[in-house]
């Protein structure tokens, strides 16, 4: 399914046009609708043993693939607020602090509609406890079927991960280059 309108939502004309996949325009009534990207966040979580923690996705798109905890920013919410909220919702734990890593464009296909996103990635720090971070996690059943700890020793390790989204591969490579010099 394409993201094109068949009729203008304002005047119901069939002359609505998609201009360079950036906006819809109706020459009959002047209606303009820009195809803006949605903001989303992801968190890179390093456990106390040096492994990275990934979610196993419970739903489409890419059900069963690995993902970084995260999700879409809500209206009137900053990327940082979304990162804390999404981590808490999906894992049951909240970071004590986060640090911006990088952002990358992504395409998120949901119910046959393509959503263009700008994914902002953060590394997450947690207060030390007797338990590892993964032992404290409780996944949100509608989002996560479980968690997996994986040791990353090289860029090749990142390339071989069955990640749901390419933007996460790119963010992990930036994180790895910053933390393994």
Language-model-derived ranges and their functions:
Residues 42, 53-56, 135-136:
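Beta-strand scaffold of nucleotide-dependent catalytic cores
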Residues 21, 36-40, 61-63, 68, ...:
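Short connector loops at helix/strand junctions that flank enzyme active sites
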Residues 1-43:
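Acidic, metal-coordinating catalytic segment for phosphate/diphosphate chemistry
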Residues 164-181:
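Charged phosphate-binding loop/patch that engages nucleotide di/tri-phosphates or the phosphate backbone
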Residues 28, 57, 70, 149-154:
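Active-site donor-binding loop signature of nucleotide-sugar glycosyltransferases
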């Amino acid at each position: 399914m394409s993201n094109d309108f068949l009729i203008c939502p304002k005047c119901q004309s069939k002359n609505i046009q998609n201009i360079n996949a950036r906006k819809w325009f109706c020459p009959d009534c002047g209606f303009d609708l820009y195809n803006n990207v949605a903001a989303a966040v992801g968190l890179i979580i390093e456990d106390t043993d040096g492994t990275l923690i990934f979610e196993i996705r419970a739903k489409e798109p890419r059900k069963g693939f690995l993902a970084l905890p995260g999700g879409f920013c809500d209206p009137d919410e900053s990327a940082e607020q979304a990162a804390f909220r999404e981590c808490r919702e999906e894992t049951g734990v909240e970071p004590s602090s986060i640090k911006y890593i990088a952002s990358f464009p992504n395409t998120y296909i949901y119910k046959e509609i393509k959503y263009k996103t700008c994914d902002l990635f953060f590394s997450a720090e947690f207060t030390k406890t007797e338990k590892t971070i993964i032992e404290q996690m409780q996944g949100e059943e509608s989002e996560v079927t479980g968690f997996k700890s994986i040791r990353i020793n090289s860029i090749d390790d990142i390339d071989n991960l069955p990640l749901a989204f390419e933007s996460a591969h790119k963010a992990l490579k930036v994180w790895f280059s910053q933390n393994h010099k």
